[in-house]
Amino acid sequence: MENWSALELLPKVGIPTDFLTHVKTSAGEEMFEALRIYYGDDPERYNIHFEAIFGTFCNRLEWVYFLTSGLAAAAHAIKFHDLNKLTTGKMLFHVQVPRVASGAGLPTSRQTTIMVTKYSEKSPITIPFELSAACLTYLRETFEGTILDKILNVEAMHTVLRALKNTADAMERGLIHSFLQTLLRKAPPYFVVQTLVENATLARQALNRIQRSNILQSFKAKMLATLFLLNRTRDRDYVLKFLTRLAEAATDSILDNPTTYTTSSGAKISGVMVSTANVMQIIMSLLSSHITKETVSAPATYGNFVLSPENAVTAISYHSILADFNSYKAHLTSGQPHLPNDSLSQAGAHSLTPLSMDVIRLGEKTVIMENLRRVYKNTDTKDPLERNVDLTFFFPVGLYLPEDRGYTTVESKVKLNDTVRNALPTTAYLLNRDRAVQKIDFVDALKTLCHPVLHEPAPCLQTFTERGPPSEPAMQRLLECRFQQEPMGGAARRIPHFYRVRREVPRTVNEMKQDFVVTDFYKVGNITLYTELHPFFDFTHCQENSETVALCTPRIVIGNLPDGLAPGPFHELRTWEIMEHMRLRPPPDYEETLRLFKTTVTSPNYPELCYLVDVLVHGNVDAFLLIRTFVARCIVNMFHTRQLLVFAHSYALVTLIAEHLADGALPPQLLFHYRNLVAVLRLVTRISALPGLNNGQLAEEPLSAYVNALHDHRLWPPFVTHLPRNMEGVQVVADRQPLNPANIEARHHGVSDVPRLGAMDADEPLFVDDYRATDDEWTLQKVFYLCLMPAMTNNRACGLGLNLKTLLVDLFYRPAFLLMPAATAVSTSGTTSKESTSGVTPEDSIAAQRQAVGEMLTELVEDVATDAHTPLLQACRELFLAVQFVGEHVKVLEVRAPLDHAQRQGLPDFISRQHVLYNGCCVVTAPKTLIEYSLPVPFHRFYSNPTICAALSDDIKRYVTEFPHYHRHDGGFPLPTAFAHEYHNWLRSPFSRYSATCPNVLHSVMTLAAMLYKISPVSLVLQTKAHIHPGFALTAVRTDTFEVDMLLYSGKSCTSVIINNPIVTKEERDISTTYHVTQNINTVDMGLGYTSNTCVAYVNRVRTDMGVRVQDLFRVFPMNVYRHDEVDRWIRHAAGVERPQLLDTETISMLTFGSMSERNAAATVHGQKAACELILTPVTMDVNYFKIPNNPRGRASCMLAVDPYDTEAATKAIYDHREADAQTFAATHNPWASQAGCLSDVLYNTRHRERLGYNSKFYSPCAQYFNTEEIIAANKTLFKTIDEYLLRAKDCIRGDTDTQYVCVEGTEQLIENPCRLTQEALPILSTTTLALMETKLKGGAGAFATSETHFGNYVVGEIIPLQQSMLFNS
């Protein structure tokens, strides 16, 4: 054993041979010799000395290891034997304030000394190791036997020494690891330290909201500019300049020993820059010309901790007083230290040793470059400089660019055909982390858009009700509406009484919303904004039983979205998109037909006779055939004399003319126009039905009925002459109760019909013809009255009823009609034989005929239905033949019907209300001849022209005169109470607003049909799969995780490290003995500011794939289903999700603990998939909002102007839209996401999610922006972080001398999750067409940051150049 040496038992220490003269390289030999001294002695004595010897051994090796690293330049090491008794050290430093001598006449500053307090931080490190009982037994026993015993003894020695070496190595690494963590705890990010340097003067003032906001903006700007620095660029000058700023931002230490850490050329080392080996390799390769290998004189030992008047330490507090503390104190106070001279000299003298280090020159500073790879290599401890950073990105899908953006900034790089250039964008293209193009469109979003929660307004309504009506005086007018149910009996006759009262009618909130154009809708001045909670439902307050109650109804169709959220030009562009996908073309020469139609229905000379014929025929084929010659003659006369297509005001007459006057009764050129009108109606009908439905059925209804309201039998046309064949689920009310079959009676034309004629004014029963309209006829009739007429008249038509009892008597109760000559022979077809002149002899004068038929009939018929071959009396007698088919007086019927099965999810009890005119007619001019018999019926927003009503009714005339602002055609003219049910109608205020101003062209007709596309999950599925814009946009939110390397700069000697020998304790067991090695380390900051700072220098890899996988809400909210089982299965199949088959126990477990029910793919080549969550967004949201960091909610949640600790004020700042937000000064950019209780708040706010039963295992990138508690917590943290850092921006002269320069609370979040703390998401490169993305890929690196517009398409550039350079910078 005497021949063994420790060099054979322990590896050599990797240090220079001339290093540390007093710490020998034979430390291992000394350890071995010490063990041999006690070999075989008393075990108790051995154990005691073993622990002491091992502690000294560890102390020497770990400090040798530490002092050889460049990190030691940031330390000032001191040995203090009584450190174990020190718990909290408080040190006072004398600082003399620098002064500047001033000129004559100016006051001079006095000499000032400041006492600065520093606290020590205790951070012990510890490591255990075990020795088996067998090893210790062999070591304790004396062997005098065979060689085998000696071998066993040697093996035991080897085992012990291996354990000791491993433990010593752990202590070596642990000291560096502990010191690095200490430096990081007092090293804020560069963007914080630099901002404090720039705003040091602010710290001397009382901080106001403007200054605090400026500080935050500086934080964000510098963070975005320096994040992933080394991935951004390979520009040497830029990197060198940044590293220089990084070093200059730090404060110098007060312990500047000029003899230590100097280069061979005499340059003083200013600090050390530490990072991972990868970052250092990049920097050294970039700045190789600025980095040199220098010999640096480093201290070879640590100093002793002594109390002397010369050093900066004046007091230390202990829990236990040292035995010799009083004597030290006596020496200090006497001023004559009697300490041994050798100890004082040893304390002041430092042994130096030359070390070879990489040194870089940064401005005036010389800095050591160091990486700690050797410390963490092959260990299970993560390098503190390796961290994860979570960044949240957002981008739009389907935004509409208004007409004023009809330009391009892409020059000639991209050429799109007209179809693509002008189409609404429904797709977003992005790049994933591998720079592969990714696409997301509305089809990909079906797993979110089709979930029952989106079509369920109950949570929104609950919040809306709990919040109550607004109490501000300016908003009281929003609460005045009453929706009263009145009996329909005599409703038409009661209309004048409504206007006779001359009382101003409160406007509904829906009407008020239409007053705000797109630019004003999102502003604070929009007082109706609080009701805009959900894109699929209308919310309002109204009066009921003298109480203000909340009302929520489905919007039913896309056209009911407010004009500010879906303006007319958007609907027109959407119609072009539908037409392109349908690939339908209008009939030939349709422009001329529509021109004639428009001229006719807007002509002030439209003949009144047409209205009388319409009422007499009322859609009856027999009646029409009886007077077909009369009708044909009217058409020919009016076309030749006035260029009018008469009878064009009535769908029934137009279709009868097109069908029954094709046998030569009408000239072909005229018949062509009527048939063209029907062809246009059929074209619009086809536009309103998506291609590929193939007469599909769902829940025993055609799929087309789920897509567009025109194909739903529950929607009725405003003017009705026949009942439809399909009346399933529809209730018709003529008086008080819905009609049943017993209350519907058939007309018997041609036989005695005295009872019916006697009941012409009766409300019940309802008399109908035997003929029932087919589904196709019903749809065409709706297209005519809901699309064609409003678009061509701009709502300048009106409903009209005639007093037939009086009118027919006054017209036809004359001898000319009662005593017809025998010579008259009229065929059943209505034609007169050539031998007869219908009793009119040649000698009869025109005057005699006029006298025979009367003045009123003459005015109606003459020049309209007469010609050279048909005198007035004959024409009048032809008209008289239709009297036998006369109907009853006009009635307004109320049609009540539920919605289709897909739309009943949210409000299953909702019953829609429509009011239709029965036995009336549509008029486009006010009758003058028939004025005494006319009754205006303004029952519908399309058919309530106040000009016509005022001309026919003195009460309405006086009403409009007194309230001139009601003289309008955009739906602002108030309807009688019985018809004013805005929130229960199928077509609401936005329809009449559009039709009042739309151009009189076919496209406007089709636009009204496109606005009738339904809002339902089934309709969304069919529209999106046909690549048709659904009427709203999406904001996609995605969080990506980046694995990054930090760069740390620390000034020289910025931290004092106080140490002593490790303490070794043992814990004996039966089979082993465990030794615990503990090293007490105390550190003291030696700066009067921040002496260290960090930055996120390099991204190693992106953990997520940066893809576009949409969050599956069917798995997030697994328990929600649609009420109709067949509809639920159809929607799930279309969206590509399965219906869960869960037992009760599984359900409870999922809702309580969460469950990852998503199946893993068979093979995943993209790594961890990022989840995109979708926020429904108005299409008019400003695209510029997505070009800078902003809150995906549409309203800023970062509120530095409000004390976040005042929860009420903080909540108000988040949700009160009467105050502008902090970022854009608008109330919001997305009311469906920014308000309390809105749709996205319900989806992503945990408070609401718990009510819906969500699966907590799914990560939600949106939750951080919607969870109120999390928002307020983030604001509290940010508020406190800024305040705390600004306190540390003060210098010790004017600031608090007790301030400790450490990272304050929130710094970790500011680095690792800045988006959550600042409540903003970052833009990312996205385009609306693949062509624009390909252009960006070809345009070089700089193209990725540029946002561009190309007519209706756009590019959103990235603000952090991820795709531009970071992920692909070689």
UniProtKB/Swiss-Prot annotation:
Q: What GO cellular component is one of the record's annotations?
A: T=16 icosahedral viral capsid
- Coarse class of the primary localization is virion
Keywords of the record: Capsid protein, Host nucleus, T=16 icosahedral capsid protein, Virion
Q: Name one Pfam family in it.
A: Herpes_MCP
List the subcellular locations. Answer: Virion; Host nucleus
Q: Which domain of life is it from?
A: Viruses
Checking InterPro entries in the record gives: Herpes_MCP, Herpes_MCP_upper_sf
User: Is Plastid among the key words of this record?
Assistant: no
Which GO molecular function, any one, fits this protein according to its record?
structural molecule activity
* Family recorded in the similarity comment: Belongs to the herpesviridae major capsid protein family.
Role this protein plays: Self-assembles to form an icosahedral capsid with a T=16 symmetry, about 200 nm in diameter, and consisting of 150 hexons and 12 pentons (total of 162 capsomers). Hexons form the edges and faces of the capsid and are each composed of six MCP molecules. In contrast, one penton is found at each of the 12 vertices. Eleven of the pentons are MCP pentamers, while the last vertex is occupied by the portal complex.
Task: Please give the subunit comment from the record.
Answer: Homomultimer. Makes the hexons and eleven out of twelve pentons. Interacts with triplex proteins 1/TRX1 and 2/TRX2; adjacent capsomers are linked together in groups of three by triplexes, heterotrimeric complexes composed of one molecule of TRX1 and two molecules of TRX2. Interacts with scaffold protein; this interaction allows efficient MCP transport to the host nucleus. Interacts with capsid vertex component 2/CVC2. Interacts with the small capsomere-interacting protein/SCP.
What's the protein called, per UniProt? Major capsid protein
Gene source species: Human cytomegalovirus (strain AD169) (HHV-5)
